[in-house]
């Protein structure tokens, strides 16, 4: 951690003297580091100005998912969902973050039934009664990023699938309950994992949450198969996603060999995921996108 004089300008760019801004914050982090904890770097801490701009992006992300929620039904193709997302995002002066990201060809990820994540929208994928689908929307607005996803049950779904969707949402809610300043990401991830396991499910180990806001994917990586007492300290100003991928069967998966994007459960059983973008605050958390 860089050394700054107490009367110097604070590293956060507020224009305030360090002693009246982040001095106590850094002292708290240093104390936790000396106790053996992993602490965030300054570039993981969003400034108040950045937070306000990211919130504007988040509002668009929420509005786009709200539109999808109003229109999704049996008979809709996942390509139609992609069209909606593109139109609803660009009409608000924003850009779909997935489009052309590392070669991803579409504006949204649409993962149906046994697709764990990164489902590519297609005219050939027609939603059927009984399907479950994750729609993962990410937005760039004036250079600031937001990211969240929701599950949708198409018509009447089986009790098994409905329970998976509901428990996965509960996992995210439990994650939020464990977002507290100076607490550990590992404790939060462990609580999420345990709720899934207690309901007979598995959680994908290799894919987790991530920092977001100034870039699409930032540090820290947030595991949802973690041990208590481990992981980075959650400090006010940190922003990341809570997005466990919960499987009805095995946690093993495979990647489509043709497109190298779409991920499926190894046993063909359903997978579910809800995603929220959260800001750590002085007294808990604030939802940025959901």
Across the structure, where does each feature detected by a protein language model lie?
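Active-site neighborhoods and metal-handling regions in enzymes and metal-associated proteins
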Residues: 5-8, 14-290
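Conserved N-terminal segment of EGF-like repeats
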Residues: 1
């Amino acid at each position: 951690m860089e050394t700054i004089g107490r009367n110097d300008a604070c590293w956060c760019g507020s224009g305030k003297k360090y002693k009246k801004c982040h001095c106590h914050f850094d002292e708290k982090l240093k104390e936790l580091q000396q106790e053996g904890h992993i602490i965030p770097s300054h570039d993981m801490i969003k400034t108040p100005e950045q937070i306000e701009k990211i919130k504007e992006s988040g509002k668009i992300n929420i509005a786009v998912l709200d539109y999808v929620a109003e229109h999704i039904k049996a008979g809709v193709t996942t390509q139609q969902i992609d069209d909606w997302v593109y139109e609803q995002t660009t009409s608000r002066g924003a850009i779909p973050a997935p489009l052309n990201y590392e070669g991803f060809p579409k504006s949204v990820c649409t993962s149906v039934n046994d697709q764990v994540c990164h489902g590519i929208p297609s005219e050939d994928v027609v939603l059927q009664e009984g399907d479950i689908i994750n729609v993962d929307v990410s937005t760039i607005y004036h250079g600031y990023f937001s990211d969240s996803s929701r599950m949708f049950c198409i018509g009447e779904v089986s009790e098994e699938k409905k329970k998976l969707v509901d428990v996965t949402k509960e996992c995210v809610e439990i994650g939020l309950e464990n977002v507290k300043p100076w607490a550990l990401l590992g404790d939060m991830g462990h609580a999420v994992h345990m709720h899934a396991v207690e309901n007979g499910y598995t959680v994908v180990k290799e894919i987790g949450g991530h920092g977001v806001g100034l870039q699409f994917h930032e540090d820290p990586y947030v595991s949802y198969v973690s041990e208590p007492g481990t992981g980075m300290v959650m400090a006010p100003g940190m922003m990341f996603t809570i997005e466990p991928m919960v499987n009805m069967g095995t946690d093993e998966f495979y990647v489509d060999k043709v497109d190298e994007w779409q991920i499926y459960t190894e046993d063909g059983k359903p997978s579910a995921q809800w995603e929220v973008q959260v800001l750590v605050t002085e007294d808990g958390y604030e939802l940025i996108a959901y």
